[in-house]
């Protein structure tokens, strides 16, 4: 509840070409009784983020605390103004990276009252994705339906282009979403009339209709951009295919190690007289009938590369059977 009466000051004069409204607020010391400390870095990051999300808006951040004043007593001040909006945001995040394509892919459209704005750029020296999602200027750190829609349309669209351009055969398996998003920096901002957030912290968007809207609008704009920029789609697909091949090679290596570990650690048949050589190319396995034959075979074998396995029952001649 407010304490004290509202105080107004002279407002800007429209005749002098000044417009706008000034709103001031201070935390209630009766509620925040432990202490009030404003963290400059936190506030600066959030205001810069808002300036990126609302291109053309000028935000002035002034720290009037005594500790922040310069030698002449002037407060520390920063101005955030980004006419390019989230396109400049992506450029800012990629300034230390090697962009795969100089032009940032930009989407700005609206459907069923939902506004969708997205900026995307792949980098050759990055091997993971960096996707920032926002809903009504709120950072959705846990993702949500808008991020799901973006990931889905990226995977579908680029796989379609890969088949269309002959980069992948029809019989080949599709590129995984992680392969396609490798090196991607993206900012996705949606404006939803009636947002539904999961949890009190509003970190995940839950509107189911947003998934399809993002899929539709981003897919249309992305396909159009790639159609007119064949060199860009070629570079993106080349990186995605390299990521796919690397993932497949890593998977095969893991399976080989696991299979080898299983063979080395698993219990061998009790009556098997194994050989010492571990290379299957150089080894032989003799299957004999009964323990008596097994004993005779063990006496005459070369332990280095010959293994003996006695079994019960008569061996079937499979070729004749």
Please describe what each predicted stretch is.
Residues 1-321:
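GHKL-family ATPase ATP-binding module
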């Amino acid at each position: 509840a407010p304490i004290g009466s509202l105080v107004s000051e002279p407002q800007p004069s429209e005749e002098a070409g000044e417009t706008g409204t000034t709103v001031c607020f201070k935390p209630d010391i009766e509620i925040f009784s432990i202490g009030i400390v404003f963290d400059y870095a936190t506030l600066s990051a959030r205001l810069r983020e808002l300036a990126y999300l609302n291109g053309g808006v000028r935000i002035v951040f002034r720290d009037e605390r005594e500790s922040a004043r310069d030698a002449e007593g002037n407060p520390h001040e920063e101005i955030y103004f980004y006419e390019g909006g989230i396109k400049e945001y992506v450029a800012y995040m990629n300034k230390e990276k090697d962009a795969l394509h100089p032009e940032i892919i930009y989407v700005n459209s609206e459907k069923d009252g939902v506004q969708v704005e997205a900026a995307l750029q792949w980098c050759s020296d990055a091997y993971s994705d960096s996707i920032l999602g926002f809903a009504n200027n709120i950072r959705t750190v846990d993702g949500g339906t808008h991020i799901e829609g973006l990931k889905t349309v990226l995977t579908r669209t680029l796989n379609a282009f890969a088949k269309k351009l002959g980069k992948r055969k029809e019989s080949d398996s599709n590129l995984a979403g992680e392969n396609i998003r490798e090196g991607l920096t993206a900012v996705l901002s949606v404006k939803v009339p009636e947002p539904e957030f999961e949890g009190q912290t509003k970190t995940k968007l839950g509107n189911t209709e947003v998934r399809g809207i993002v899929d539709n609008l981003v897919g249309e704009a992305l396909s159009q951009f790639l159609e007119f920029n064949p060199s860009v789609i070629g570079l993106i697909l080349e990186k995605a295919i390299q990521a796919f091949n690397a993932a497949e090679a890593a998977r095969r290596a893991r399976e080989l190690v696991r299979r080898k570990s299983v063979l080395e650690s698993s219990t061998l048949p009790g009556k098997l007289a194994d050989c010492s050589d571990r290379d299957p190319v150089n080894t032989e396995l003799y299957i004999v009938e009964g323990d008596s034959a097994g004993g005779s075979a063990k006496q005459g074998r070369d332990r280095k590369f010959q293994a003996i396995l006695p079994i019960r029952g008569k061996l079937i001649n499979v070729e004749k059977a």
